[in-house]
Amino acid sequence: MSADGLAAFLAEANEFRTIPIVRKFVADVIEPLGVFANLREEAVFLLESKDDESPWARYSFIGVAPFLTLESETGETFSVKDENGNEQITAPTLKEAFQWVERTLAVKPLAETVPFTGGAVGFLGYDFISAIEKVPRHKNRDVPMKTAYFVFCESLFAFDQKKRELLVIHYIRLSGNETEEEKIEAYRAAERRMADLAAKAARPQAEQPLLPAESESGRTASFAKAVSNYDKKQFLRDVEAVKRYIAAGDVFQAVLSQRFCVPVQAGGFAIYRLLRYINPSPYMFYFQLDGVEIVGSSPEKLIQVHRRRVEIDPIAGTRRRGRSPEEDERLADELYHDPKERAEHYMLVDLARNDIGRVAKYGTVEVPVLLQIGKFSHVMHLISKVVGELDDNVHPIDALLAAFPAGTVSGAPKVRAMQILQELEPTARGLYAGAIAYIGFDGNIDSCIAIRTAVVKDGYAYVQAGAGIVADSVPELEWKETRNKASALMNAIEQAERLFAKGERAVC
């Protein structure tokens, strides 16, 4: 036990009720997936950046031992519960519930270079929109899960891939009534806990079966056992219905989606291992919480807040990566000059400017990057960057909600497009097209759109994907686009079943 560390802790305990202690390690022989596998009995989330080609790939986080949850069934009220499920407070909004946690915990600020050092981690389902906009609630919610669910963890593992550093952050929680001896014992217990976690993290990975190198990113998903929530003929008719709304001037675009249900025996973690190998992405995540596993590989940021600077990076327009540098350059040039891709992208940039403008100081909204080719491991996109500075009276959560949901998964204008989608789509979207996010005690937020995402629950995996319908859309091609967008996840599921599943399969 460090005497200096203990003295600092005792001084901080006079001012704060929740105090982080930090240990740094060189992360040269461990990596996030292996550490999570070793800590799976207590760990609830793994957030990774796995695309070396992406400018956003640097940090990964693991959360261990949640002590509070912030959750909502419908988005209309939020409950904060302790680790035993006892409700502590009910609040009308996400922001008010989070602010109650901030006040109650009274967390000592932590000056570290990693962007997230503790706070809430979880998801907002797409259906949350009905609580904040004039969008009717869908009548058919056939996959029961919370609309919002966030956890606050006692311990956090933060990896910096660039520096090859690991920070282990452990929060000591006090009531404010402890004697000095009790505070000293709390510090000693935290030291023992961190030593135990570090030892578990460094264990060999003997209990995890090796992933065969034959797992193929190029394999085509068969969809053989998948059942769609959409009859194909009805989907094609609904594409035409959206086009009629466009012709009438209601919207410019709406993103119509279909959901695939697949019976699974392989667990969500096996699917995640395949997915990160097949389709690495800037935003990869695995959650095991509230009876649900969530597996995702999202390419697209929803919104980021860092030191009150807000950023949205609109993505629209896609080409595969070339098989040679020359083909790669040709495809990039083709994408950049495609008039349809550019028109859609400009529309999304305007949406992002509007979203940030709702919460930013007047005159601070800028577009420092416009129509840049962003290259990822398997594809390239047109990418722009829209930034602004949060207004003084705006909470970072206000920025998250201003951008929710993304225009790329709803349409334009957003609210009218979502009203049309609620009318046409046969089932509620659930998590799909919502957000995966962390909300830091320090006000930092990072979030991605919940696309390329599977929900694994009660022996089934649910995968949903959409296509942006515009005036000249061809229904058959839009149907194929939804399947193409779901194919990476379906491929991961099918390979996980082939490699790891045992026993009889259910039927959707």
From Swiss-Prot:
GO terms for biological process: L-tryptophan biosynthetic process. Chorismate binds at residues 317-318, 432, 452, 466-468. Its cofactor is Mg(2+). Feedback inhibited by tryptophan. InterPro entries: ADC_synthase, Anth_synth_I-like, Anth_synth_I_N, Anth_synth_I_PabB, Chorismate_C. Its EC number is 4.1.3.27. GO terms for molecular function: anthranilate synthase activity; metal ion binding. Pathway: Amino-acid biosynthesis; L-tryptophan biosynthesis; L-tryptophan from chorismate: step 1/5. The keyword Lyase applies. It is an enzyme of class 4 (lyase). Binds 1 Mg(2+) ion per subunit. It catalyses: chorismate + L-glutamine = anthranilate + pyruvate + L-glutamate + H(+). Disulfide bonds: none annotated. It comes from the Bacteria. The keyword Amino-acid biosynthesis applies. Mg(2+) binds at residues 344, 481. L-tryptophan binds at residues 49, 282-284. Keywords: Amino-acid biosynthesis, Aromatic amino acid biosynthesis, Lyase, Magnesium, Metal-binding, Tryptophan biosynthesis. Part of a heterotetrameric complex that catalyzes the two-step biosynthesis of anthranilate, an intermediate in the biosynthesis of L-tryptophan. In the first step, the glutamine-binding beta subunit (TrpG) of anthranilate synthase (AS) provides the glutamine amidotransferase activity which generates ammonia as a substrate that, along with chorismate, is used in the second step, catalyzed by the large alpha subunit of AS (TrpE) to produce anthranilate. In the absence of TrpG, TrpE can synthesize anthranilate directly from chorismate and high concentrations of ammonia. Belongs to the anthranilate synthase component I family. Heterotetramer consisting of two non-identical subunits: a beta subunit (TrpG) and a large alpha subunit (TrpE). This is Anthranilate synthase component 1. It comes from Bacillus caldotenax.
